[in-house]
Amino acid sequence: MEFEGIIIEQLDTKTGTNPTTGMEWKRVSYVAQTEERSPQTVVFDVWDGRDGRIQRLHLQTGMKYRLFLNFEAKKNKEGKWFNVISAWSAREVSIIDENKNGEEQ
């Protein structure tokens, strides 16, 4: 799914080790918001394993991005369901000045 919005906050960074593979991982959470009349907000994670995704995406607070998100439902040990929203790609969106016939600033 695509979501276009501004990163309004970077949340916590968590690290750990996969008990099965022994591979270290890192996760950074972000909050993004659309610029609509009634803004929509989403919290999502960027996971970093061997691919260096966190550094590659280099998301910055205050910048506008087109985010490519995966949604997955999981069940915890108590049997309750929850959603996991992860970004697998992001592209910075150019700012358009509509007063200049749609030319980029």
Label every model-predicted segment.
Residues 1-105:
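Single-stranded nucleic acid-binding surfaces, predominantly the OB-fold ssDNA-binding core
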